[in-house]
Amino acid sequence: MDIYDTQTLGVVVFGGFMVVSAIGIFLVSTFSMKETSYEEALANQRKEMAKTHHQKGEKKKKEKTVEKKGKTKKKEEKPNGKIPEHDLDPNVTIILKEPVRVSAVAVAPTSVHSSVGHTPIATVPAMPQEKLASSPKDRKKKEKKVAKVEPAVSSIVNSIQVLASKSAILEATPKEVPMVAVPPVGSKASSPATSSQGKKGQGAQNQAKKGEGAQNQGKKGEGAQNQAKKGEGAQNQAKKGEGAQNQGKKGEGAQNQAKKGEGGQNQAKKGEGAQNQGKKGEGAQNQGKKGEGAQNQAKKGEGAQNQAKKGEGAQNQGKKGEGAQNQSKKGEGAQNQAKKGEGGQNQAKKGEGAQNQAKKGEGAQNQAKKGEGVQNQAKKGVEGAQNQGKKGEANQNQAKKGEGGQNQTKKGEGPQNQGKKGEAAQKQDKKIEGAQNQGKKPEGTSNQGKKGEGAQNQGKKGEGAQNQSKKGEGAQNQAKKGEGGQNQAKKGEGAQNQAKKGEGAQNQAKKGEGVQNQAKKGVEGAQNQGKKGEANQNQAKKGEGGQNQTKKGEGPQNQGKKGEAAQKQDKKIEGAQNQGKKPEGTSNQGKKGEGAQNQGKKGEGAQNQGKKGEGAQNQGKKGEGAQNQGKKGEGAQNQGKKGEGAQNQGKKGEGAQNQGKKGEGPQNQAKKGEGAQNQGKKGEGAQNQGKKGEGAQNQGKKAEGVQSQSKKGEGTQNQGKKGDGNPNQGKKGEGASNQNRKTDTVANQGTKQEGVSNQVKKSEGSPNQGKKAEGAPNQGKKKDGSPSQAKKVDAAANQGKKSEMAPAQGQKASMVQSQEAPKQDAPAKKKSGSRKKGEPGPPDCDGPLFLPYKTLVSTVGSMVFSEGEAQRLIEILSEKTGVIQDTWHKATQKGDPVAILKRQLQEKEKLLATEQEDAAVAKSKLRELNKEMASEKAKAAAGEAKVKKQLVAREQEIAAVQARMQASYRDHVKEVQQLQGKIRTLQEQLENGPNTQLARLQQENSILRDALNQATSQVESKQNTELAKLRQELSKVNKELVEKSEASRQEEQQRKALEAKAATFEKQVLQLQASHKESEEALQKRLEEVTRELCRAQTSHANLRADAEKAQEQQQRVAELHSKLQSSEVEVKSKCEELSSLHGQLKEARAENSQLTERIRSIEALLEAGQAQDTQASHAEANQQQTRLKELESQVSCLEKETSELKEAMEQQKGKNNDLREKNWKAMEALALAERACEEKLRSLTQAKEESEKQLHLAEAQTKETLLALLPGLSISAHQNYAEWLQEFKEKGSELLKKPPTLEPSMDIVLKLREAEETQNSLQAECDQYRTILAETEGMLKDLQKSVEEEERVWKAKVGAAEEELHKSRVTVKHLEDIVEKLKGELESSDQVREHTSHLEAELEKHMAAASAECQNYAKEVAGLRQLLLESQSQLDEAKSEAQKQSDELALVRQQLSDMRSHVEDGDVAGSPAVPPAEQDPMKLKTQLERTEATLEAEQTRRQKLTAEFEEAQRTACRIQEELEKLRAAGPLESSGKEEITQLKERLEKEKRLTSDLGRAAIKLQELLKTTQEQLTKEKDTVKKLQEQLGKAEDGSSSKEGTSV
């Protein structure tokens, strides 16, 4: 029950107030008659109130069991879910004694009795060191202290005191000071059955004690009590008898769980000098002591958390202080987990025998007691639920291993510890580098739960490899549930002990915030989660004489010891076997509580051992998809998960027996009810205990018919006890693999040799471990009729005995024992405490019975025999007496005895054959299993690597969680201080007296009543008017929607009509395409004719070429026309290009004409549909255009002919011109040669002439000189010409000769003159010759000049003729150009016609496309409008529903106001004066009501606007509909195409406008609907706020009434 819930708090406080007021009146009336003090009267009053309050709390707990599961998350934020460690409250009374021998005193609101059995909180045996409050005076003193510490006002005060008491527990542990726990009133504090971990009641057996004779799981000796069997309720969890030995007391005088000697040593004390439970070697540290000051069992490294070590100094499994002491080690001299002291106290026994295994103070909560003292680790309900596996201080550590002192897995005399690997073997929790938790061995040797080298914790399963109880993603320890932080039991933020979950809050298995225990069972008497072994030895303690769960033999390997690299007991290999899945409850060796397998599945059959909340996962449920500890395959059930209601492995139920409930001895370990379900029996008897997935073998599942894991026998051997020297639980032979020994193919945990023998099969013929009764279902009852774990076959057959060939579980190598062999050997093997006293086992049916002769004769005489039976008796007697058998035959015997024997032999042979076939089938299945195991082994290697990585990541997460825990611890301390201050103020108010408060409450109630009356009346009137208006508006809107739906239907009809028109247009287009093809065929014919004409033109062109050859003869004209022809050729080329372009244009014109014809035809076809008269005119025009086109085509053909002729002429002319060119070139070359020759001659002549002239000048000069020399008297000018000079010389010489010479000339001069004359004459002759030559050359030049001139004249004549021809050709070209221009003009006219028609056609196409597009758009818009209308309709419907809801909510508000009124009136009867803060509530309510009225009025106005706009939208829709109808009516009347197009445009524009208007109207409607919806939501919020305020006001009034005591 959550005391912070406002409703429950109000109800409880108000009820308490009424009860206390009545009690107070009664006390006041009787106060004067008795001479008692006021303090005593007040104490008695508070006692009575506490009892009444507690009874109410019990009722509410029973009614709200489901609510507890749902409120787990809320409890994390509240102090009762996680108790912080803070300073002690000054009011808490603590009794301090010696740290070792003094037990704590539980201060409770009820009196503390001296008798141990009647203590309300915790059973504390009488101790010589401590005097309990036995005398009446002492009782009164105690009661006074109680009155001061815990005034029973309400559950708030109790919760705060529990916080203080819990802080005292946490602070006192390091100094070995017992804690004082003050449980809340509602936590069954007064019930005598709420003793510690296993204390049930006077006769309530311990954790595993089930029914009257229901032995505990491991109850071994005659009167040996259960693990937690207290006696009448007195002894500790492990206290067995009067001073019965510890938790593990097994045989008659069996010592404690680990107590091995006469009674001396501690839990781990094995022999005389056996070391402590955790004592490893000579100086071996304690169970959890790792290094010099190493922490306890789970203490990993420097700051490594203990098995349950949670935060900075988080406590060990039992570690309470800052991390100092050993598992149970509390103070400096605190005893070890297996305290060695004088008489070997209990395993965790701290005082002389006082506290329970986890008992911390007298009434201190269990190790895992986390909350206000509410749920134990396995707190079942209220009546007598034991703690989960109350681990605490005395609880042996989950994985207590000790080296020599046999650990949890004590093997034999000196065998290795469960985790003992060598002398210095690491502790069970020794991690090696701080690695694995509880069961880590060395060298990768798997711990109890060790999976691989970096193997995860005890329950670490597969990829998600979380710890045994690892729940979340962040690898918690064995029971680690919470954020991923804590060790084996670390559950919440405050990482307490092994089971310590929250900051000091939940139990070992307490998973959620403070919710149910790990194995929270139910209520009536469900046993603890961790009820494990026979005497619930430490988590795995099994053997007969107190050996551990996996006690192997003298020196067998550890339970999980496989080999050096053997996989851990729980090594699953991705879904493989369970962690410690053993026999008897197949719980893992270390399967403890927190995450323990289904073993502790308590609830009504519901959750698994660790299954916490509604869907909480099992103990082994690991993380994201990790299945439960036993959950192996895809949907495989948990280890003990039975089915829907099937009992779990340890499913207790109301009176269900414990995990190992045998029955009177026979039932299996998990036999729960009538002896029916197997340990692992899941649903209809289907899956084994550990049945994992589809093909996953169970822990003990061997083959299909292999017996179950825990088959015990007649209840004799321990869970793992094999014989004296018998190998341990899974030990089969000397080399037989351990419990989890897989061999090479990783066989199942119990599968040993070929997978057949059971896990626990003991010795040669010893009955199975869990051998139950004659028909008791096996522990792991499979299917297919295969014998179950406990299947007996006449209660005798071996566990695994399938046939003569199937090796039994204990069958060692190839020994194949017959079915009867174990039956004979069984009694000899079971003598050492095999049967429990008063528990007869099932009879050995085949064993010899020794009866007296008289009784035999009497029985035989009284029996009636058949003939066959009588014959058999005769045979037996004849064999005894030696009489021949034939003499005893009857004369009337029907058959021959030999024939009968033959028949029997045949029947036996048949049975043998069937058994052999079954054996062959089993062998084949074993081979398949071996293959599967090989594949699983490979998967396991990958899984281990992943798990190692996850461990590293999760260690980091643990560090982060520790930091968070420290912060949350500080916050909790602050909250506790604040709550203590509030408690003081409440106490002060209580002391002031109830009268003033009652008066105030009466005034307040009257004010509230008036305000509520006014508010309800106003709200009702306004809501009624608003609802009426809303209904009217909704009816209007509905009508409008109907009208709009009709309009949309009409629009759909119009759209269909438009679609029909579009179909007709498509047909017309197809017709036009056909006509277009016909016109193309006609054009092709025309082109063929043109090609023929071109051929003719080519022939004429050839003729012209012949004429051109004749013209080549005129070579003289070629020279003249040469230059002009080039220009003419250029022009001709340009003309040719123009002609080619004209040709192309003509072709285009033809194509366009054809297109025009086609378009005209299409236009005609279109016009014919609507215009009957215009069709005839258009046909005539078309015919005229066709005739015109034909004429144009004929003209074009003529032009083409002319152009072809011109081309031929031009080509002929070109040929002639080419010939003339060639001749001209030849003539030019000849002329050039002649000119060159003449020039050379002229050059040579000019040179000769120059030379001759030079010689003449020289000769003349010489003659002049000589003549002047002869005739010096002559004076002649030298500048004269030579001829003139000679003439003058002749004249002057003759004159001189005529004169008488004065001197006679000499002969020399005369000779010289003669020589000069001769030379002159010779020179003159040469000059004459030169002159003649010059004259000849000049003549020749003149002749050449004349010839050249003549040739030039010839060329000029030719050029003139060519020019004339060119002129003629130009004239013809001009004529052709004129013709072409005319054709162009005609073509342009046709082009204009064509363009006009194409323009018309394009416009028609555009209009058609636009019309079709607009039709489509219109259809889309109509569809959108329809959708908008539908949406508006749906929104209006929603508005209606919301209005209805609002009206309902208003009615609820009215009802609540009336209830408040009546409640306030009721409060006036016993009320007090009003409190000033409550007077403000009616004013607030009035103001809020006024606001709601204003909002309702605004909403009404908005709704009116909405209706108006909706009407406008409806009108626009009607207009659109009318216009569409008009368009439909006007459609067929229109005639002309152009008018139709314009009208279509207008219509489409109108339709667009109308659709846009409709869209706007729809948008407005949507906006208005949104606004109305927002207003409705606002009104809802206001109504909710009003309701909340009313509820708060009601709660406040009730709380004030309750506090005014």
Swiss-Prot record:
<feature type="repeat" description="9">
    <location>
        <begin position="276"/>
        <end position="285"/>
    </location>
</feature>
<feature type="repeat" description="17">
    <location>
        <begin position="356"/>
        <end position="365"/>
    </location>
</feature>
<feature type="compositionally biased region" description="Polar residues">
    <location>
        <begin position="274"/>
        <end position="338"/>
    </location>
</feature>
<keyword id="KW-0597">Phosphoprotein</keyword>
<dbReference type="Pfam" id="PF05104">
    <property type="entry name" value="Rib_recp_KP_reg"/>
</dbReference>
<feature type="repeat" description="29">
    <location>
        <begin position="476"/>
        <end position="485"/>
    </location>
</feature>
<feature type="repeat" description="24">
    <location>
        <begin position="426"/>
        <end position="435"/>
    </location>
</feature>
<feature type="modified residue" description="Phosphoserine">
    <location>
        <position position="1178"/>
    </location>
</feature>
<dbReference type="GO" id="GO:0005789">
    <property type="term" value="C:endoplasmic reticulum membrane"/>
</dbReference>
<feature type="repeat" description="3">
    <location>
        <begin position="216"/>
        <end position="225"/>
    </location>
</feature>
<feature type="repeat" description="14">
    <location>
        <begin position="326"/>
        <end position="335"/>
    </location>
</feature>
<feature type="modified residue" description="Phosphoserine">
    <location>
        <position position="111"/>
    </location>
</feature>
<feature type="repeat" description="35">
    <location>
        <begin position="537"/>
        <end position="546"/>
    </location>
</feature>
<feature type="repeat" description="11">
    <location>
        <begin position="296"/>
        <end position="305"/>
    </location>
</feature>
<feature type="repeat" description="19">
    <location>
        <begin position="376"/>
        <end position="385"/>
    </location>
</feature>
<feature type="repeat" description="52">
    <location>
        <begin position="708"/>
        <end position="717"/>
    </location>
</feature>
<feature type="repeat" description="27">
    <location>
        <begin position="456"/>
        <end position="465"/>
    </location>
</feature>
<feature type="region of interest" description="Disordered">
    <location>
        <begin position="1571"/>
        <end position="1605"/>
    </location>
</feature>
<feature type="repeat" description="51">
    <location>
        <begin position="698"/>
        <end position="707"/>
    </location>
</feature>
<feature type="compositionally biased region" description="Polar residues">
    <location>
        <begin position="435"/>
        <end position="479"/>
    </location>
</feature>
<feature type="repeat" description="4">
    <location>
        <begin position="226"/>
        <end position="235"/>
    </location>
</feature>
<keyword id="KW-0472">Membrane</keyword>
<feature type="topological domain" description="Lumenal">
    <location>
        <begin position="1"/>
        <end position="7"/>
    </location>
</feature>
<feature type="modified residue" description="N6-acetyllysine">
    <location>
        <position position="1135"/>
    </location>
</feature>
<feature type="repeat" description="34">
    <location>
        <begin position="527"/>
        <end position="536"/>
    </location>
</feature>
<feature type="repeat" description="38">
    <location>
        <begin position="567"/>
        <end position="576"/>
    </location>
</feature>
<feature type="repeat" description="58">
    <location>
        <begin position="769"/>
        <end position="778"/>
    </location>
</feature>
<feature type="compositionally biased region" description="Basic residues">
    <location>
        <begin position="52"/>
        <end position="63"/>
    </location>
</feature>
<feature type="compositionally biased region" description="Basic and acidic residues">
    <location>
        <begin position="420"/>
        <end position="433"/>
    </location>
</feature>
<feature type="compositionally biased region" description="Basic and acidic residues">
    <location>
        <begin position="561"/>
        <end position="574"/>
    </location>
</feature>
<feature type="repeat" description="25">
    <location>
        <begin position="436"/>
        <end position="445"/>
    </location>
</feature>
<feature type="repeat" description="41">
    <location>
        <begin position="597"/>
        <end position="606"/>
    </location>
</feature>
<feature type="compositionally biased region" description="Polar residues">
    <location>
        <begin position="526"/>
        <end position="540"/>
    </location>
</feature>
<feature type="repeat" description="40">
    <location>
        <begin position="587"/>
        <end position="596"/>
    </location>
</feature>
<feature type="repeat" description="57">
    <location>
        <begin position="759"/>
        <end position="768"/>
    </location>
</feature>
<feature type="repeat" description="13">
    <location>
        <begin position="316"/>
        <end position="325"/>
    </location>
</feature>
<feature type="transmembrane region" description="Helical">
    <location>
        <begin position="8"/>
        <end position="28"/>
    </location>
</feature>
<feature type="repeat" description="23">
    <location>
        <begin position="416"/>
        <end position="425"/>
    </location>
</feature>
<feature type="repeat" description="5">
    <location>
        <begin position="236"/>
        <end position="245"/>
    </location>
</feature>
<keyword id="KW-0007">Acetylation</keyword>
<feature type="repeat" description="47">
    <location>
        <begin position="658"/>
        <end position="667"/>
    </location>
</feature>
<feature type="modified residue" description="Phosphoserine">
    <location>
        <position position="1162"/>
    </location>
</feature>
